[in-house]
Regions:
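Short amphipathic, positively biased membrane-proximal segments
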Residues: 1-220
Length: 220
């Protein structure tokens, strides 16, 4: 009954996303040397999974400098914000059809992530030691979102042109599933990598900071 009460366009969106796995999976020939295939392989099997490595290294640097007793919950919450700024466009790029809406979100998120990164460092250096190696790790974390965005833009140059022209078609500003979804095995594997290498470590960091804040508050 609730579905029947929705507008026609909304119904179309619901049905489209309900059947988002029905299309043929995107296939990238492993032996192809075409620029488009090579770029897509680098993005999906290089940039995105390897993004976890500097993220995990940064978490270790925070732990080593005992973030829970220095900048504490405030900085850890900023890290959670930055993961959200990076995570939303990644999920959209993996599941949704790349169009002006998705590209605009990706661009806005990249700018927000960069601004938050500057605030994060300015906050951290006042409260704890930020070593040169950690600053170098930050460089990777700042450039990788831009790298992913650049490769996505090159793979969808037609949509970049539409974005620059204001997205004249109605579907340019609708969130739609990919015509050829990424293989379920790939999505599951990447989700496991992100969960184990990003979500769990930083959740542990935030929990550690909250517990330390409670402990310090009770001693006052």
């Amino acid at each position: 009954m609730a579905l029947r009460a929705l507008p026609r366009k909304t119904l179309q969106n619901v049905r489209t996303w309900r059947d988002w796995r029905r299309g043929d999976d995107l296939r990238i020939p492993a032996d192809s040397t075409a620029v488009e295939d090579a770029s897509r392989r680098f993005l999906l099997f290089g940039a995105l999974p390897l993004w976890v490595v500097p993220g995990l290294a940064d978490w270790w640097m925070h732990r080593r400098t005992r973030i829970e007793h220095t900048s504490g919950t405030k900085e850890s919450a900023v890290h959670a914000l930055m993961m959200t700024e990076a995570g939303i466009p990644v999920v959209m790029g993996l599941l949704a059809r790349v169009n002006p809406l998705v590209l605009s979100v990706m661009g806005g998120a990249a700018l927000a992530h960069g601004a938050t990164a500057v605030y994060d460092v300015s906050l951290a250096v006042k409260e704890r030691e930020v070593r040169p190696i950690e600053q170098h790790i930050h460089s990777f974390l700042e450039v990788l979102p831009l790298t992913a965005l650049a490769f996505t833009a090159c793979l969808h140059a037609d949509q970049v042109r539409k974005t620059l022209r204001g997205g004249p078609d109605p579907q340019d500003w609708r969130l739609l599933p990919k015509e050829h979804p990424l293989p379920a095995a790939y999505l599951a594997g990447l989700a496991a990598i992100i969960a184990g290498g990003v979500a769990l470590p930083y959740a542990e960091e935030l929990r550690r900071c909250l517990r330390a804040a409670v402990g310090e508050g009770s001693r006052r």
